[in-house]
Amino acid sequence: MRPIMLVGHERPLTQVKYNKEGDLVFSCSKDSVASVWYSINGERLGTLEGHTGTIWSIDVDPFTESCVTGSADYSIKVWKVQTGTVIHTWTAPVPIKRVEFSPCGDYILAVLDDVMRYPGSINVYKVSRDPVTKEIKEFVEEPILVINTQENHKGVTVAGWSAEGKYIIACHKDGKVSKYNAKTGEFITSIELHTQTIGDIQFSPDRTYFITSSRDSMAYILDVESMEQLKSYEADCPLNSACITPLKEFVILGGGQAARDVTTTSAREGKFEARFYHKIFEDEIGRVKGHFGPLNYVAVNPQGTSYTSGGEDGFARIHHFEKSYFDFKYDVEKAAEAKEHMQTASA
């Protein structure tokens, strides 16, 4: 896989995201600027400028009409993708660590950090759209839902929506994962999963299960309804991000030795690679090198044809999957396919 390097940020990347169609990549960074790129060739469409601090998170709605950013400058901004202009700003008492549109695009989830005596919360904001153009016409200024952190939990680091926006899944600094009713904010359950802070949560294409990644070098897949642990993946370095690939039964893990702990310039020592694991068998099947610092985020194209990594080195790298990626199968998978083919032929 020959990567396309996206050069446009001056400081470490914090998140990269594809739109639903997979033709655009959105990136944000500690340089307070977000960028929009064509995923096919890495050409930059433009920048989103207006924040005055680190942009910790970015997301794009299902219609690629608008995108939302959350920043350390205590603000959440909504942007019109076509023009790159700010169409609304919400202010908060603390930095925003994660933002995400609901699957229907009518709600925005924001994770507020637990700093400066603020206990931390998940705020949900509502927007109203034109039924035809899907353009946002109205913003509700106050959050319609504020989910405060449970007493016996540490602050929320990241959160996301389940299928149809039914639940909000939240990950905590103490390694716990919580589930809330997205309509009422009611706490449903929580489990102790990781031994260190959880840095990322990403969902399967149908949003019925999700993967978490942590500084404890582990990634887990959990079922949304039962909160049961389905799979686990162990890496040899702290993990910052993990995603689930469509089309193929793989997961991609990204991380590496923390930048402040690196005492050598060798990328091999820091383990700055994207790791591919088989989703079912939990085996590591390959690595992709390239970054010369930890991978802060990995995101996969919803169409399953590429993935993008954002690094501490200030670069994002788009990797388009080659034929060998799609052809890769375990012997047991090949045998199962051959058996199915024979049964179909004889039927």
Curated annotation (Swiss-Prot):
One of its GO terms (biological process) is formation of cytoplasmic translation initiation complex. The keyword Repeat applies. One of its GO terms (molecular function) is translation initiation factor activity. One of its GO terms (cellular component) is eukaryotic translation initiation factor 3 complex, eIF3m. The keyword Cytoplasm applies. Its main location: cytoplasm. Keywords: Cytoplasm, Initiation factor, Protein biosynthesis, Repeat, WD repeat. It is found in: Cytoplasm. WD repeats lie at residues 8-47, 50-89, 91-135, 151-190, 193-232, 290-329. It comes from the Eukaryota. Component of the eukaryotic translation initiation factor 3 (eIF-3) complex. PANTHER family: EUKARYOTIC TRANSLATION INITIATION FACTOR 3 SUBUNIT I. Component of the eukaryotic translation initiation factor 3 (eIF-3) complex, which is involved in protein synthesis of a specialized repertoire of mRNAs and, together with other initiation factors, stimulates binding of mRNA and methionyl-tRNAi to the 40S ribosome. The eIF-3 complex specifically targets and initiates translation of a subset of mRNAs involved in cell proliferation. Belongs to the eIF-3 subunit I family. HAMAP family: eIF3i (MF_03008). This is Eukaryotic translation initiation factor 3 subunit I. The lineage of its organism: Eukaryota, Fungi, Dikarya, Ascomycota, Saccharomycotina.
